[in-house]
Amino acid sequence: MLISKRRLIHAISYEGILLVIIAIALSFIFNMPMEVTGTLGVFMAVVSVFWNMIFNHYFEKVEHKYNWERTIPVRILHAIGFEGGLLIATVPMIAYMMQMTVIDAFILDIGLTLCILVYTFIFQWCYDHIEDKFFPNAKAASLH
């Protein structure tokens, strides 16, 4: 199977919970209808998934061409390239949908990125603990 059930559940739960958090938080903070902030969250998630596939495809080609090892500097370069490209794609979307300037949208996007970093850490930690407690053989089974 190309994508394991475990990875699919992980991805859907990660994106679903994040979407709810973003929609509610942006709606509350900016006094915007949840339809707007929820739609923005969906658009950003879709862009992120496609950008992830495109960016990683080409990054791995460069990595292979120059025989890069996945060292910390290469990981930092990867993270900066990925997040930088994502910012370029999402800032205009945020500015348009939230009816704000590009500068304000950039600041909001940086803030969202930092919040998502914290969310990702918490989600991963919780997911690992839940999986270990209720599905102790899931990781090993997905490796086969």
UniProtKB/Swiss-Prot annotation:
TM regions (residue ranges): 9-29, 35-55, 76-96, 103-123
Bilayer disposition of the protein: Multi-pass membrane protein
UniProt subcellular location: Cell inner membrane
Observed effect of gene inactivation: Inactivation of the gene results in at least 8-fold reduction in tolerance to cadaverine and putrescine but no change in tolerance to spermidine or spermine. Deletion mutant also shows decreased chlorhexidine resistance.
GO cellular component, one term: plasma membrane
Keyword Transport appears in the UniProt entry: yes
Induction and repression of expression: Transcriptionally regulated by the AceR regulator. Strongly induced by the short-chain diamines cadaverine and putrescine. Only moderately induced by the triamine spermidine and weakly induced by the tetraamine spermine. Expression is also induced by more than 10-fold in response to chlorhexidine exposure.
Superkingdom of this protein's organism: Bacteria
Alphabetized InterPro entries for the sequence: BTP_bacteria
Regulation of activity: Protonation/deprotonation of Glu-15 may play an important role in transporter function. Cadaverin transport is inhibited in the presence of CCCP.
GO molecular function, one term: antiporter activity
Recorded family membership: Belongs to the proteobacterial antimicrobial compound efflux (PACE) (TC 2.A.117) family.
NCBIfam families, A to Z: AceI_fam_PACE (NF033663), PACE_transport (NF033664)
Subunit structure: Exists in a monomer-homodimer equilibrium. The dimer is probably the functional form of the protein, and the assembly of the dimer is mediated by binding of chlorhexidine and promoted by high pH conditions.
Name this protein carries in UniProt: Short-chain diamines transporter
Native source species: Acinetobacter baumannii (strain ATCC 17978 / DSM 105126 / CIP 53.77 / LMG 1025 / NCDC KC755 / 5377)
Lineage: Bacteria, Pseudomonadati, Pseudomonadota, Gammaproteobacteria, Moraxellales
Gene: aceI
